[in-house]
């Protein structure tokens, strides 16, 4: 009884569906973009920077570079000039998609056993990272340059203006950054790195959200 019911129900569903109308006609799209722009970033300062760059006539690439420069300042736990990244550029007019690899590369002296300790065991994550052995050769600035030469519209210097202004005049620390500073302090990581502690404790006082 149940099997017959399921079979009839399936037939009913299939019969109730409208047939698809297939056509060989190709859809054409306008090659003029008139839909404005949208910016998404991890911090409002970076979003505002990207919007300002676009309003000045900059390209999406200009906006992305300027926004990332600001992110390196306002969220140093996640971004910065010491790392790497990718660029994926879509040209609306030509329909071309271009990928640029700007990730870090291993140092010339890197060896297969560089993360092995003298007793033959592998370093833990927290042993390897502060040792200096985990540092790759940064690729982000070269990525900026390559992308800007290919797709930039504004002068190179214009992309740094907001980051320089915020670094010179200050910015509101996000709760996330304040949390990471607290975490690093409780783990004793800032004590082991006087330079980092001085940066996050200007005038001897911890940065606050």
Question: Where on the chain are the PLM-derived regions?
Answer:
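Sec-dependent signal peptide recognition
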Residues: 2-9
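C-terminal motif of bacterial Sec signal peptides marking the signal peptidase cleavage site
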Residues: 15-16
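Noncatalytic scaffold domains of N-terminal-nucleophile
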Residues: 19-48, 52, 60-61, 65-209
């Amino acid at each position: 009884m149940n099997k017959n019911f399921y079979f009839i129900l399936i037939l009913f569903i299939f019969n109730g569906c409208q047939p698809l109308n297939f056509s060989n006609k190709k859809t054409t799209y306008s090659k003029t973009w008139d839909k404005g722009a949208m910016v998404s970033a991890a911090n409002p300062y970076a979003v505002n920077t990207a919007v300002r760059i676009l309003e000045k006539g900059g390209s999406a690439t200009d906006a992305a570079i300027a926004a990332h420069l600001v992110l390196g300042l306002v969220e140093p736990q996640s971004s910065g000039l010491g790392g790497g990244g990718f660029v994926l550029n879509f040209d609306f007019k030509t329909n071309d998609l271009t990928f640029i690899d700007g990730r870090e590369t291993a140092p010339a002296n890197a060896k297969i056993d560089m993360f092995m300790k003298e007793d033959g065991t592998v370093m833990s994550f927290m042993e390897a990272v502060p040792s200096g052995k985990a540092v790759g050769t940064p690729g982000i600035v070269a990525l900026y340059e390559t992308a800007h030469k290919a797709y930039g519209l504004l002068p190179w210097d214009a992309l740094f203006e907001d980051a320089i202004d915020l670094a010179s005049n200050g910015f509101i620390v996000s709760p996330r950054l304040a949390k990471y500073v607290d975490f690093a302090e409780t783990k004793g990581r800032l004590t082991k790195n006087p330079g980092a502690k001085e940066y996050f404790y200007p005038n001897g006082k911890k940065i606050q959200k």
